[in-house]
Amino acid sequence: MAKYEILYIIRPNIEEEAKNALVARFDSILTDNGATIVESKDWEKRRLAYEINDFREGLYHIVNLEATDAVALNEFDRLSKINGDILRHMIVKLDA
């Protein structure tokens, strides 16, 4: 299984319950498509290098996971581009 890290930035003015629901939804998207989540945690609220969608800060969330193929990653990528609560995301394959 290959190891991956996903970092995504959530808009800063989201309510705590909505943020938790968003994180749970995207975690379930990954697990439903065959990935195994090793760790999913909030990093911190950070200032952005440049303004994104009129926001100067964002809530960073990190997910470490293992996957045998790219199905879960492709679905996460597709749905996170559509979702207005996620400002940016990045998927990185970690060295074995």
From Swiss-Prot:
A single GO BP: translation
Natural source organism: Streptococcus equi subsp. equi (strain 4047)
Pfam families per UniProt: Ribosomal_S6
Lineage: Bacteria, Bacillati, Bacillota, Bacilli, Lactobacillales
Function summary: Binds together with bS18 to 16S ribosomal RNA.
UniProt-listed CDD domains: bS6 (cd00473)
GO MF annotations, alphabetized: small ribosomal subunit rRNA binding; structural constituent of ribosome
Family of the protein in this entry: Belongs to the bacterial ribosomal protein bS6 family.
Keyword Ribonucleoprotein found: yes
Cleavable signal peptide: none
Name under which the protein is recorded: Small ribosomal subunit protein bS6
Gene Ontology cellular component annotations, sorted alphabetically: cytoplasm; ribonucleoprotein complex; ribosome
Cystine pairs: none
